[in-house]
Amino acid sequence: MKQSTNIANRLREVLLNGHWIANTNCKEQLQLVTWRQAIHKVGNLNTIAALTFHLNYYLSGVLNAFNTGKLEIKDQYSFDMPPVENETNWQKLTDDFLRNAEMFAAKVEEISDEQLQEAFIDEKYGTNLRNVEGMIEHCYYHLGQISLIRKLIANI
């Protein structure tokens, strides 16, 4: 199996369909959340909607970078989410996230093993492989947060 296929499968596992590492995945967790739960604030934690937006921001931005060779996202904007005021807004956010998750995994699967070792946009960002592995770790980190917040607000 190509390394990129293996990594794409790991992305799909955390984002869309896996249970091996965390016994859940982002898609599964988000489908259990109502829009009111998604925007419910617990202390100083981010909301589930904000975390979903944040993950989608990076998936979309890095996917765009892979497609265009230009990195056009900035960390400072990664939580600049438009208001989620109803179920339609929440559904659009989750649909966009899930679509970008699959497109990102599909794009990674297309990358050759040689390209995985090449610089991601600029050498200062490391290799394509390092950035995809970082995305996987980033997604697991926020999946854990989403899962815990969902448990804290289960009765809302």
Locate predicted features.
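Short, contiguous alpha-helical
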Residues: 2-5, 11-30, 35-80, 121-156
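Acidic/histidine-rich alpha-helical segments that form the ligand environment
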Residues: 84-118, 130-135
